[in-house]
Amino acid sequence: MIKTRIEEVQLQFLTGNTELTHLKVSNDQLIVTTQRTIYRINLQDPAIVNHFDCPLSKELETIMNVHVSPMGSVILIRTNFGRYMLLKDGEFTQLNKIKNLDLSSLHWINETTFLMGIKKTPKLYRVELTGKDITTKLWYENKKLSGGIDGIAYWEGSLLLTIKDNILYWRDVTNMKFPLVLPDESEQFERLKHHAIKKFDSYNGLFAWVTSNGIVFGDLKEKQMEKDPASNNFGKFLSSSKVLLNFELPDYQNDKDHLIKDIVLTAFHILLLRKNTVTMVSQLNNDVVFHETIPRHQLTGSNTDSNEKFLGLVRDSVKETFWCFSNINVFEIIIENEPNSVWNLLVRDNKFDKALSLKGLTVREIESVKLSKAMYLFHTAKDFHSAAQTLGSMKDLSHFGEIALNFLQIKDYNDLNVILIKQLDNVPWKSTQVVLSSWIIWNFMKQLNDIELKINTTKPASTDEDNLLNWNLNLKEKSNELTKFLESHLEKLDNETVYQIMSKQNRQNELLIFASLINDMKFLLSFWIDQGNWYESLKILLTINNHDLVYKYSLILLLNSPEATVSTWMKIKDLDPNKLIPTILKFFTNWQNNSKLITNISEYPENYSLTYLKWCVREVPKMCNPIVYNSILYMMITDPRNDMILENDIIKFMKSNENKYDLNFQLRLSLKFKKTKTSIFLLTRLNLFEDAIDLALKNNLIDDCKVIVNDEILIEDYKLRKRLWLKIAKHLLLSMKDIDIKQLIRTILNDSNEILTIKDLLPFFNEYTTIANLKEELIKFLENHNMKMNEISEDIINSKNLKVEINTEISKFNEIYRILEPGKSCDECGKFLQIKKFIVFPCGHCFHWNCIIRVILNSNDYNLRQKTENFLKAKSKHNLNDLENIIVEKCGLCSDININKIDQPISIDETELAKWNE
């Protein structure tokens, strides 16, 4: 319920018997005036009071009227001498251009523009403040009416004026020519017989006008309710205005103590001041919601019962606060919970949007307003789309089933979707989101199917072309609408449910759209493969780079689009070719079967599986297991084309990929499919040289035989090479006819590199071979044999001489030896000889290795010393034999290396000498 109370405001700056003349409040700026002074208080900081002494010319000149702009930055002052002044930024400015205009009413349009009504003459001016200057424009003048303009209301182009007992209304003056002439509407009421301080007020498009019989009030914002000139309601704005009759007011008596002194509008109520009583009446039902009398106060030092006179009511249109003031006091009228008290009345009057715009409503109240609005739009206004928009914004789902049923009964799936989508955006529960989203998808499918049915049943006649075009446009729009919904609500959808709904409705395009949006590449891939669209399938494979899917669909793609499939495989990183071998072999079998039908070898199709595996071997050899190499060779060997180029390619591949394939398996294949040269190559790799020679000879491949016997492996195996050459020679000599036998023999002997001789060939000559054919080779053989016998004889003689020399040396060495007695010491250091490595010279002197080296380094044999030093500096100690050869050249005692010690004195051991003297 609405709560209203009146609180007195303490104005500490007023002292003594100072009386107030005017009160204005704008944007929390409270303006109080006395007869000559203006006080300004910021209600946000009321302790600071700014006062301005009005520059009046004479003592009798006083402030007569005060008008404050909506934001409180401009104060317009009129004195009793007819002068106008502007107070802005603390400075007063004279407005001489309007000094001759007798102001009766004023309405601010904005902070610098206002409409000004003239007293006695019905004229309306538009005044614009430009700095310290003003510009005026005559908006209205009526020479037929008498009296001035009492009230002005203006809202977004709508204008309302009151002139004595007349009220004039213009629906929109924005594009009209000024000054205005005839109004769109006008009414005449009984003139107010008594004088009121203010008998008209306007606020945010609302207006209220005090007449003799009561208060006429309305709302300029309702001007757009009826725009059709042909309608019966067009031009009935004034007649639809409401009236609050005087007798509806409490304590009404037609005397001066109960007459209306001032009127102020709130958003939904009318505040009235009658003497010292404030009454508040609802604009919606004319009910009195507040009625209170303010106690009067006495002036200081006055002997009368009361000197307080209530002057008027004031509204702060920006902050929506309300005030009442007398000549000595200011009161604030505090209104609380105004929206909560009127929302149900607005709903009763079908003013739902206005009710929803109220501040402070509870969630339950808002939901109730929305439901009432939706039911009115659905059942009364038949505006199903607007009803759906309203219902969709509701959070209360208790009536949802009934609402949905209403739309289903009229088969309005489009507006039902509006509700469902809005509800989907609001509900936080996942389960509810799944239900709503699935329902929405089903509705979309139903709509799309219905549109397609109409398209299919519309005859393609010229008369139906427009309808057909419209249905196609509707189909496209609905499809776009579905796509937008899916894009914006993906996280609220259950993918499997959506798939099921679309699949059962056979909506393939929508399935593709949805799968693309959720990036379900598996579904898209499966779909395109089912449709046989290999291009799209491969494009998806390349995009997702999923190896498992590549392996899964490899066979069907390779069989139907081999070139593109292989190209795609090559682009996919880290693809394992070993896992594709089963697919490749199946493709190769199919390729073989197709190739059998082709008679012209040049028309053979390309084996793309072989192309791919060769690419793998070349580009990613580390990923290729032996099965890859075996598969390549298998396809090459079993190729129905049997030409030398193919065999050369096989052998070339084998040579470049040694030890990476199964030799035995490939040999069996080669023999089975009669790839002779390949078989020969494999036999040699298996060291089956005799079998290789036999196979080559069987096929009369003499050059291949020669290559075999010259293999590097056979270089050390003379006997095997000879056996192989004997096979070749036998074949040549026994099988060749009508040839030059003499030349053949020479060729065999030369090619064998003297492995064979004419003697080896003799068993292979037939009985018809003449000696003339053998003469030259026999002579050469005998000459060579004679030379070899001579060489052998010389070798025997040399061997005998060598034996004699060896025996002589052995005898000499048997005489050269020395016997060392136990305890033998080094001739240099005197220590036991056996504790270190030592050398014994033929002269019998013995030295440790290190001792003899020291002797050499201290000797005067510069040649020997230099050799020793160079060896030690070079640190070539790994070859101690070289050092030994150096140090054993001369004895350290009895050779010339010790000659530099001749001049040195002999050292005598005194202890030893004493022993000899005993």
UniProtKB/Swiss-Prot annotation:
This is Vacuolar membrane protein PEP3. Required for vacuolar biogenesis and for trafficking of hydrolase precursors to the vacuole. Mediates transport at the vacuolar membrane where it may be responsible for tethering transport vesicles on the target membranes. Acts as a component of the HOPS complex that acts during the docking stage of vacuole fusion. HOPS is an effector for the vacuolar Rab GTPase YPT7 and is required for vacuolar SNARE complex assembly. It remains bound to SNARE complexes after vacuole fusion. It is a peripheral membrane protein. It comes from Saccharomyces cerevisiae (strain ATCC 204508 / S288c). Component of the HOPS complex which is composed of PEP5, VPS16, PEP3, VPS33, VPS39 and VPS41. HOPS associates with phosphoinositides and the PX domain of VAM7. Interacts with PEP5, PEP7 and VAM7. Present with 2020 molecules/cell in log phase SD medium. It holds the Pfam family Pep3_Vps18. CHCR repeats lie at residues 585-741. It is found in: Vacuole membrane. GO terms for molecular function: protein-macromolecule adaptor activity; zinc ion binding. The modification Phosphoserine is found at S907. Belongs to the VPS18 family. One of its GO terms (cellular component) is endosome. One of its GO terms (biological process) is vesicle tethering. Keywords: Membrane, Metal-binding, Phosphoprotein, Protein transport, Transport, Vacuole, Zinc, Zinc-finger. PANTHER family: VACUOLAR PROTEIN SORTING-ASSOCIATED PROTEIN, VACUOLAR PROTEIN SORTING-ASSOCIATED PROTEIN 18 HOMOLOG. SMART domains: CLH (SM00299). A zinc finger (RING-type) spans 826-851.
